[in-house]
């Protein structure tokens, strides 16, 4: 009966998780969103690749036997690594990939392009034995036209060699053992096959035209009453005859109502291209802001003389203007931005898989950060995955776009040329995104030549020669005089790093690119900001206080709200825990761990968001209250609470004392100070209630009020005897797609009968699975079984290429009569958004990693409990 009730509880919990959020994100492919019936199709090339780690001779040849190579799906990061994987434990060197697939005979005569979103390091791509592309750099697209090399109706082979080994000849250039992040490796982002007709809209990265290629959307005057949009599109005709037709635009609002359209006549000679420009004047405009990230849909069609669509797709645009006024800070859409912009840096590193995140994991990263009220992300230290950028566009996160680089310069001219090329391709890839706030073309913390900063700023403006384009540079770096936005600390923050008042330029504006980290020295890296979640309450409380308002002067949330308008905000270092090359310790300073499990500081950040619900946001918003005290025998007597409410009450135990806090109305500094109620919790009070059989009377209850109304509550209870494992899916309401690549985190927790999580527990959880999913990682990477840390044990689940149900079971590794009862949860994958291309036999043969489910588990708990009641009585009698 106990097991049945547990299963029903978990099933109900899972239902709530999936039902909570109706919104399902959609992701761009090669910079566009597909429209059916246009002749343009995107196919996922992610499934069924063969992979070999190391050098191998002859693997580019069609006849090479790869049957012994490991089967994998993209994104692939070469290997699965444990949560603690710093100090260069990851593989560096060559890795080879091969993919077999049948090219549909119906594709013959059309244009087909392989589009790799990124391949780490230096790479080569062969198709059917012919070298088609060499590429240097691990963060930008690799594009290969395969139209004339494919064998239609037959088997084809793509071979990729990727080498993530140390190489100073191209950026970042820094050897990994002296690098503050890791390169990871492999084909770690998506690969697409794009099919079009021979008259088509070009791709800006493929064409390599300054401020050209593809579609370029820019803006003139912007206001709610009337906004000017400039649209430029490059078309190409590779057919054997001339083309006459039209280029058609439709701008749709969020309700899919057409608010503007345009038909431009065009003629293109064979083997030629043309660029058409037009302007649109839009009335009654919904402007894009971080708190109102309104996206219009721009449909683009190419039609022939018979009015038949021969190419087309849509992109999402947000209409907004950016301005940094001399000494007066940031202005958005013609109005001064009302408060400092607070954000965080983001590496793409995730537990177990490294950089090889699925699109949904990228989206959930952005969603979790936006839930805290952050408004800007710095892409440290390279351009991020397009899926993450898609998320920033629709969730309302400004982005500082970084050039790949970190504390390294190579004086060889070729190195600088690679940097310049990266900058151009970053702008071309992301120039239409409303989320892009600043371009950071300089190399992070690097002593580059005197002319470099001026040169790269010029390149950005060559590629974006329109209004609302801004670049930023460190205030103390060479060439900073050319930049109107400079990175530094505020005078209210870290005095060591801040510009002295006599050096502050009244014509400039300032921003803190990295704040919060506080190491003793740059060798030991001991820091009160670096608190592993597994270390528990006190370190997490110290971290949160340091980020909010420490007892010493330092750049923190509070300090950034004590600046003039000239200092426009700052980004925390760092949002998530991540691996590093040059230090054996991971970076523990994230507000979440590398599985994106929150620390106390996450809720401190969340308490700074506005307390009014915002219906314009997909992300969470509105009032919140959180008790940062677990009521363990070791929990502090002082109770810390994070809340954005006007007032908060804290009730200690049923019928007990009620404590009250009211936020001062005319305060300065952070929007919501950390609340501390002194000398509240004592374990002996809980003991007394427990001995009276009044365990349910022992609790902390926080209630938040806005305008006198109760709007938020949070209750914490002491955890009793661990009796079961409970599970939940950490998916932010998104579906799991059966594309062989998508991943979702399932979290197991040791809990008591009431579902309270046993934070102080050292169990190991073994996950097993059945159905259309596989566990990512294994015992070798400490991914399964998983050690319980601060009460929880997470695991990554990956979909297969077949939609269906997935059942996950969690058990303690060593089971006995009184160990916690197994937990179960069921989820279901849905059909993929795009057709999958690959050898079907190999797609189905990808190993089902992890333990396949055995339904026999620990079912003895109920009978054991009856015996234990007698033991409990005997102990009480003899005490």
Describe each model-derived feature in a short phrase.
Residues 76-128, 133-136, 167, 198-207, ...:
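Active-site-adjacent substrate/metal-binding segments within catalytic domains
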Residues 23-35, 43, 55, 92-212, ...:
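Accessory beta-strand-rich segments of carbohydrate-active enzymes
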Residues 146, 278-287, 675-695, 784-801:
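Short, hydrophobic beta-strand segments
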Residues 363-368, 376-601, 605, 622-628, ...:
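Substrate-binding/catalytic cleft of secreted carbohydrate-active enzymes
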Residues 151-155, 232-325, 802, 827:
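Extended acidic/polar, glycine-enriched regions
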Residues 231-235, 301, 641-643, 728, ...:
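Beta-strand-rich structural segments
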Residues 16-82, 161, 165-170, 186-188, ...:
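Accessory carbohydrate-binding/adhesion or oligomerization-edge regions at the termini
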Residues 41-60, 79, 119, 179, ...:
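Substrate-binding clefts and catalytic carboxylate motifs of secreted carbohydrate-active enzymes
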């Amino acid at each position: 009966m106990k097991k049945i009730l547990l299963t029903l509880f978990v099933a109900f919990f899972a239902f709530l998780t999936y039902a909570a959020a109706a919104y399902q994100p959609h992701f761009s492919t090669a910079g566009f969103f597909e429209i059916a019936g246009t002749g343009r199709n995107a196919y996922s090339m992610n499934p069924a690749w063969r992979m070999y780690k190391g050098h191998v001779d002859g693997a580019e040849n069609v006849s090479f036997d790869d049957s012994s190579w490991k089967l994998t799906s993209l994104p692939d990061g070469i290997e699965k690594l444990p949560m603690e994987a710093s100090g260069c434990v990851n593989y560096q060197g060559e890795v080879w990939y091969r993919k077999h697939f049948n090219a549909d005979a119906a594709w013959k005569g059309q244009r087909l392009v392989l589009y790799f979103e990124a391949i780490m390091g230096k790479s080569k791509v062969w198709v059917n034995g012919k070298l088609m592309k060499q590429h240097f750099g691990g963060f930008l697209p690799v594009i290969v036209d395969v139209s004339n090399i494919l064998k239609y109706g037959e088997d084809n082979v793509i071979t990729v060699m990727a080498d993530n080994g140390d190489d100073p000849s191209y950026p970042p250039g820094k050897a990994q053992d002296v690098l503050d992040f890791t390169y990871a490796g492999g084909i770690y982002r998506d690969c697409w096959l794009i099919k079009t007709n021979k008259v088509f809209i070009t791709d800006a990265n493929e064409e390599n035209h300054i401020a050209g290629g593809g579609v370029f959307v820019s803006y003139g005057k912007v206001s709610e009453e009337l906004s000017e949009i400039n649209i430029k599109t490059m078309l190409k005709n590779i057919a054997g005859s001339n083309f006459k037709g039209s280029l058609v635009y439709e701008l749709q609002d969020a309700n899919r109502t057409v608010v503007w359209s345009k038909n431009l006549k065009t003629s293109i000679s064979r083997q030629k291209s043309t660029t058409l420009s037009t302007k649109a004047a839009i009335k009654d405009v919904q402007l894009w802001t971080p708190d109102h990230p309104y996206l219009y849909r721009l449909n683009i069609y190419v039609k022939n003389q018979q009015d038949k669509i021969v190419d087309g797709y849509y992109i999402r645009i947000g209409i907004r203007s950016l301005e940094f006024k001399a000494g007066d800070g940031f202005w958005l859409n013609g109005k001064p931005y009302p408060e400092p912009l607070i954000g965080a840096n983001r590496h793409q590193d995730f537990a177990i898989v490294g950089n090889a995140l699925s699109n949904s994991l990228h989206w959930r990263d952005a969603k979790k950060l936006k839930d805290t009220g952050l408004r800007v992300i710095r892409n440290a230290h390279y351009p991020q995955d397009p899926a993450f950028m898609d998320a920033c566009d629709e969730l309302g996160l400004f982005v500082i776009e970084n050039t790949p680089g970190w504390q390294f310069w190579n004086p060889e001219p070729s190195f600088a040329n690679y940097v310049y090329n990266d900058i151009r391709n970053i702008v071309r890839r992301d120039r239409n995104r409303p989320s892009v706030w600043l371009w950071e073309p300089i190399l992070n913390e690097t002593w580059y030549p005197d002319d470099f900063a001026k040169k790269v700023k010029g390149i950005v403006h060559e590629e974006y020669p329109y209004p609302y384009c801004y670049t930023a540079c460190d205030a103390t770096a060479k060439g900073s005089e050319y930049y109107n936005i400079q990175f530094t600390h505020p005078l209210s923050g870290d005095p060591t790093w801040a510009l002295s008042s006599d050096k502050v330029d009244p014509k400039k504006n300032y921003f803190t690119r990295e704040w919060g980290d506080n190491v003793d020295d740059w060798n030991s890296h001991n820091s009160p900001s670096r608190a592993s979640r597994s270390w528990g309450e006190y370190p997490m409380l110290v971290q949160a206080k340091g980020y909010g308002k420490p007892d010493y002067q330092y750049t923190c949330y509070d300090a950034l709200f004590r600046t003039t308008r000239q200092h426009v905000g700052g980004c925390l270092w760092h949002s998530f825990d991540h691996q590093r090359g040059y230090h054996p310790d991971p970076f523990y300073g994230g507000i979440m761990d590398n599985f994106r499990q929150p620390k106390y500081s996450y809720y401190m950040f969340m308490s700074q968001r506005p307390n009014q619900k915002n219906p314009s946001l997909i992300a969470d918003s509105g009032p919140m209250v959180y008790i940062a005290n677990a009521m363990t025998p070791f929990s502090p007597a002082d109770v810390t609470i994070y809340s954005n409410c006007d007032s908060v009450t804290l009730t200690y135990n049923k019928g007990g004392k009620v404590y009250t806090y009211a936020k001062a109305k005319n305060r300065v500094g952070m929007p919501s100070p950390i609340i501390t109620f002194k000398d509240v919790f004592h374990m002996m009070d809980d003991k007394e209630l427990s001995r009276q059989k009044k365990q349910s009377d022992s609790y902390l209850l926080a209630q938040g009020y806005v305008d006198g109304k109760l709007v938020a509550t949070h209750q914490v209870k002491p955890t009793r005897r661990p009796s079961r494992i409970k599970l939940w899916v950490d998916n932010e309401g998104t579906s799991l797609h059966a594309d062989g690549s998508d991943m979702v985190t399932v979290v197991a927790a040791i809990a008591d009968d009431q579902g309270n999580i046993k934070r102080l527990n050292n169990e190991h959880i073994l996950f097993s699975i059945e159905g259309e999913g596989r566990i990512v990682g294994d015992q070798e990477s400490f991914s399964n079984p998983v050690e319980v840390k601060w009460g929880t044990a997470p695991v990554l689940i990956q979909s297969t290429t077949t939609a269906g149900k997935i059942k996950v079971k969690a058990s303690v590794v060593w089971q006995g009569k009184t160990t916690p009862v197994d937990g179960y949860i069921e989820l279901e994958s849905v059909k993929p958004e795009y057709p999958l291309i690959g050898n079907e036999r190999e797609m189905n043969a990808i190993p089902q990693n992890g333990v396949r489910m055995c339904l026999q588990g620990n079912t003895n708990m109920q009978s054991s409990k009856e015996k234990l009641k007698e033991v409990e009585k005997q102990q009480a009698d003899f005490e």
